[in-house]
Amino acid sequence: MERAAAGPLGMEMPIMHDGDRYELVKEIGSGNFGVARLMRNRASGDLVAVKYIDRGEKIDENVQREIINHRSLRHPNIIRFKEVILTPTHLAIVMEYASGGELFERICSAGRFSEDEARFFFQQLISGVSYCHSMQVCHRDLKLENTLLDGSTAPRLKICDFGYSKSSVLHSQPKSTVGTPAYIAPEVLLKKEYDGKIADVWSCGVTLYVMLVGAYPFEDPEDPKNFRKTIQKILGVQYSIPDYVHISPECRDLITRIFVGNPASRITMPEIKNHPWFMKNIPADLMDDGMVSNQYEEPDQPMQNMNEIMQILAEATIPAAGTSGINQFLTDSLDLDDDMEDMDSDLDLDIESSGEIVYAM
């Protein structure tokens, strides 16, 4: 199974970092956002993940939103935000390191999960997303690549990447078309406001389906790169569970109630948490959201207050000296605006012609 979306890698560029506090261990990833490195805190020895983003125009609203929203979240199923550091060339976002890698890679290795294993991870995903919603934050880009695992024997799932998250406290209702095509809810593709929390439910359903089946529900397996066909199938809620995948009636019922085109009729997060399939063998620490969040009140509060962070972000919008034009990434050859306009005329649907579906790593 291929990733739902992948962006091109950037050019190599030296990255300066806070040598007084962290030391480099190794590179752990790169994408449209920049470069990610595994670092070690010199004082404590703790490992952290650091995401480096070029100073200047890349420090946009999405980056600022990611940091502000992520900082407000404290839950065992969400990657911990630690601090931001301004280097001469980059903004560095320091986060908890999840040594188990992506849930995506685990599924690729296994092919697909048993129903019990899928439920084990789905329960944790719902616990984390439900907490986000209780904090008035909708993620808007939930996918396997944005769910990491710690290194324990029974892995704890960790949600990451809040670049497209939206807070109903700080922002208006979502309207822009963002996310990864395979996971996007039908209403997100339409030119109107939508409930980001209900759209997150759909994306959680796609994650559950992929864990059980080992394929995306709305992709054509013979033409997986045809994003227009994927979008058509999403809008028509056209999916099926293969005959070779044997799941319980309760599991099938939950999937059917998630994949509902009308968001007003779709199962809600509280209803999922009370669904018989979800409740089966649920760990005690996931039973009560209040208990979960209270247990996670760690002594290491964020190192920076919001004023410090906003000042760093403001400075980060100023490009590094002499780096103009360096480390620019190639854009995907797919012209999404034209594609959406074509679909508008082909399908007689009111599609957001300026929709910003983003294929991020």
Curated annotation (Swiss-Prot):
One of its GO terms (cellular component) is cytoplasm. It is found in: Cytoplasm; Nucleus. Gene3D superfamilies: Phosphorylase Kinase, domain 1, Transferase(Phosphotransferase) domain 1. Activated by hyperosmotic stress and abscisic acid (ABA). Pfam families: Pkinase. GO terms for molecular function: ATP binding; protein serine kinase activity; protein serine/threonine kinase activity. Expressed in leaf sheaths and roots. Expressed in shoots of young seedlings. Keywords: Abscisic acid signaling pathway, ATP-binding, Cytoplasm, Kinase, Nucleotide-binding, Nucleus, Phosphoprotein, Serine/threonine-protein kinase, Transferase. The active site is at D141. ATP binds at I28, G29, S30, G31, N32, F33, G34, V35, A36, K51. PROSITE patterns: PROTEIN_KINASE_ATP, PROTEIN_KINASE_DOM, PROTEIN_KINASE_ST. It catalyses: L-seryl-[protein] + ATP = O-phospho-L-seryl-[protein] + ADP + H(+); L-threonyl-[protein] + ATP = O-phospho-L-threonyl-[protein] + ADP + H(+). One of its GO terms (biological process) is abscisic acid-activated signaling pathway. SUPFAM superfamilies: Protein kinase-like (PK-like) (SSF56112). May be phosphorylated. Induction: Down-regulated by ABA in roots. Induced during incompatible interaction with the bacterial pathogen Xanthomonas oryzae pv. oryzicola. PANTHER family: SERINE/THREONINE KINASE, SERINE_THREONINE-PROTEIN KINASE SAPK9. Interacts with BZIP46. Belongs to the protein kinase superfamily. Ser/Thr protein kinase family. May play a role in signal transduction of hyperosmotic response. Can phosphorylate BZIP46 in vitro. This is Serine/threonine-protein kinase SAPK9.
